């Protein structure tokens, strides 16, 4: 479960947590406590299965721990506190893997040569609203959602359209990112073209790769 040990003292704070975002988490805790980042002594513990859940731009459970520690200290109490999110807490306050819809219209000849490939993806952005938006979202397109298609190693004339709907479901990254859905779609479609043109799928892929 998400958890940490926090000890707020007169001269700073000690924090023990399995973090994947130490610098951001340290700064978030410092901000809540009114400290400088260097006053937060961060001890990184073994994270177990982090899978990106312990790399949250909002530093959610650690910021919460800092708020609790601040109130605990203000009440006159001293000593370390351990904060643990239950499974119910995590489901209620966590983030979800966004759903994606792919639609492709492909034109190819009898030999399997692709003449046109129109590809549309619809899905929530996991980068918009995070500190990474400035360099990972260009012209309104989340780069993490198009990887595996815009940079496909296959010689394909792909025309890609992306739509990011705004929904109230909180989403963020998961184990791996865009390739988890784009690779499945691309490879499935390549298989379909190979089968429709009567070619061995491996040989067809080798032809699409050219000299790569």
Task: Write out the residue ranges for each language-model feature.
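A residue-level signal for beta-strand positions that form part of recognition/binding surfaces
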Residues: 12, 80, 153
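General beta-strand structural signal in soluble alpha/beta enzymes
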Residues: 15-17, 41-44, 81-85, 116-119, ...
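Short amphipathic alpha-helical surface micro-motifs
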Residues: 24, 62, 85-88, 97-99, ...
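Phosphate/diphosphate-binding loops
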Residues: 63, 70-126
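Short acidic, glycine/serine/threonine-rich loops at helix termini
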Residues: 26-28, 51-57, 92-98, 118-120, ...
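Alpha-helical support elements that line or immediately flank enzyme active sites
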Residues: 4-75, 134-148, 173-212
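Glycine-rich loop/linker segments at domain edges
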Residues: 1-4, 101-188
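Residues that form or immediately flank small-molecule/cofactor binding pockets and catalytic motifs
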Residues: 20, 47, 86-88, 161
């Amino acid at each position: 479960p998400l958890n940490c040990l926090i000890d707020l003292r007169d001269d700073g704070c000690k924090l023990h947590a399995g973090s994947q975002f130490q610098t951001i988490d340290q700064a978030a805790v410092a901000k809540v406590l009114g400290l400088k980042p260097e006053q937060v002594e961060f001890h990184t513990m073994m994270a177990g299965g982090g899978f990106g859940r312990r790399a949250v731009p909002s530093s959610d459970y650690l910021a919460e721990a800092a708020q609790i520690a601040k109130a605990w200290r203000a009440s006159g109490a001293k000593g370390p506190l351990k904060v643990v999110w239950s499974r119910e807490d995590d489901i209620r306050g966590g983030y979800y893997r966004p759903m994606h819809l792919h639609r492709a219209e492909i034109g190819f000849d009898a030999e399997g040569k692709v003449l046109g490939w129109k590809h549309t993806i619809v899905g929530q952005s996991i980068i918009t609203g995070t500190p990474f938006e400035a360099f990972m979202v260009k012209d309104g397109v989340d780069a993490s959602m198009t990887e595996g298609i815009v940079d496909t190693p296959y010689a394909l004339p792909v025309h890609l359209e992306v739509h990011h709907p705004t929904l109230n479901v909180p989403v963020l990254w998961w184990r791996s990112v865009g390739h988890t859905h784009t690779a499945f779609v691309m490879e499935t479609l390549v298989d379909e073209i190979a089968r429709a043109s009567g070619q061995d799928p491996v040989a067809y892929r080798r032809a699409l790769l050219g000299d790569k």
